[in-house]
Amino acid sequence: MSKIVKQEENFSKWYTSIIENANLVDYGLVKGTIMFKPYGFAIWKRIQEEFNKILVSLNTAEVCFPMLIPYSEFMKEKEHVEGFNPELFKVSHLGEKKLEDELVIRPTSEISFCNYFKKNIKSYNDLPCILNQWGSVFRVEKNTRPFLRTSEFLWQEQHAVFADKKEAFDFSITMVNEYKKFVNDYLSIAVLMGEKTENERFAGADNTFTIEALMPDGQVLQSATSHYLGTNFAKSYDLKYQTKNNNYDLMFQTSAGLSTRIIGAIIMSHSDNNGLVLPFKIAPIQFAIVTSNEVNKDSDELKAIYKNLFGYKYQTYFVEKSLGLQLQENEIKGIPFQLILGKKEIENNTITIYRRDTREKQNISFKEFNQNFIENLIKEYSSNLFNKTEKRLNSSIEFVNNIDEFKKALDNKKIISAYWSGNAEDEKKLKELTTATPRCFDWNQKIDKTKKCFFTNKPNAKLVYFARAY
């Protein structure tokens, strides 16, 4: 186990050292790939389990599609191709045979889902159709970091088609709201929510909605996105259905996704110089019971603990010598609560509870350790983690009027709020000048004719959030 680098000394190395010490991943054989170790994958499985409940509540059916797509199919949607072309992994040969039509290893699966919809949606009775796939996608990345930017990553991608334009658009809003709620409630991370500007929009979408989380180093992380695709893909792939009037109309389409990037957000948002800190609801081990191997495994004390922890995820560690090393290992793994049952506790008929968020110990009697106490403890833990990120986010937003104030705020690791009416070219110029990008804006916001863009001085501006981003 290597030493954990202090966050305040080198944030990037601190992040990597947390991943190494918590035993989450190893590097793969190909640049930019990672191998999930059991504990790292267990975290992703917990996220998957909990988010699946939300998908089911939205009448989403699960599917699994091939990862290979003919390049000729990819070429049908011009904006999609232009957006992804530099990032594509391609297969040019099958064995020794060179392919006339190369295969793309999916960077996303709109095209596969279009193929499904074309084959299976025949009439208005088949709509809406909402599908989800858990799998991996591939994108060529120059600068890679575990979870944050990898050439292959795991995610869920939901794709849906509707007969009604408003229903489709509203569903894309529903999905970004569900992502925000999930990240707030299950991952204890406060986020900005809004719509992407033209240049930041998903390739082929009419609208992209996003949630953005602020990290302690002042950079933001795009944490999940939802897209209203309109009829862009439907036109390219001839997605039509028979209406009640026996006409044939184009389908309206949406897509949305949450990836293993979110594990990077969890690590950076909550962890400290002592290791990983995990949100309670997605922790693979929520309670670690640490005791001596001299304690009878069928003791009344352990039975009482197990009874009160019914329904939670717990693991018991019977330690041969000092409990200290096991406690430290569990702390590095970010286990929310450790229940210590040493000689002193057994003699006094008490339990010592160690909280990962505050690093504080509390000694209570077995009588006090009941389900009501546990529920309150969990609520307090989750609220504490969320409140820290919410305070960080709210205190980091700064309004600016000009480019000098913009640069100063960036240097101070701020999220910038500013009036903007620039186009895609203006966004590129601003990024070249400052390395910052527009993150999102409130889609319900009305354009103010009296306000001018801080960068171009053009009228009809709206408030947009800017930041440096991962």
Curated annotation (Swiss-Prot):
Belongs to the class-II aminoacyl-tRNA synthetase family. ProS type 3 subfamily. This is Proline--tRNA ligase. It is an enzyme of class 6 (ligase). InterPro entries: aa-tRNA-synt_IIb (IPR002314), aa-tRNA-synth_II (IPR006195), aa-tRNA-synth_II/BPL/LPL (IPR045864), Anticodon-bd (IPR004154), Anticodon-bd_dom_sf (IPR036621), Pro-tRNA-ligase_IIa (IPR002316), Pro-tRNA-ligase_IIa_arc-type (IPR004499), Pro-tRNA_ligase_II_C (IPR016061). It comes from the Bacteria. The keyword Ligase applies. Keywords: Aminoacyl-tRNA synthetase, ATP-binding, Cytoplasm, Ligase, Nucleotide-binding, Protein biosynthesis. Catalyzes the attachment of proline to tRNA(Pro) in a two-step reaction: proline is first activated by ATP to form Pro-AMP and then transferred to the acceptor end of tRNA(Pro). GO terms for cellular component: aminoacyl-tRNA synthetase multienzyme complex; cytoplasm. It catalyses: tRNA(Pro) + L-proline + ATP = L-prolyl-tRNA(Pro) + AMP + diphosphate. It is found in: Cytoplasm. The keyword Aminoacyl-tRNA synthetase applies. Pfam families: HGTP_anticodon, ProRS-C_1, tRNA-synt_2b. GO terms for biological process: prolyl-tRNA aminoacylation. HAMAP family: Pro_tRNA_synth_type3. Homodimer. Its EC number is 6.1.1.15. Consists of three domains: the N-terminal catalytic domain, the anticodon-binding domain and the C-terminal extension. GO terms for molecular function: ATP binding; proline-tRNA ligase activity.
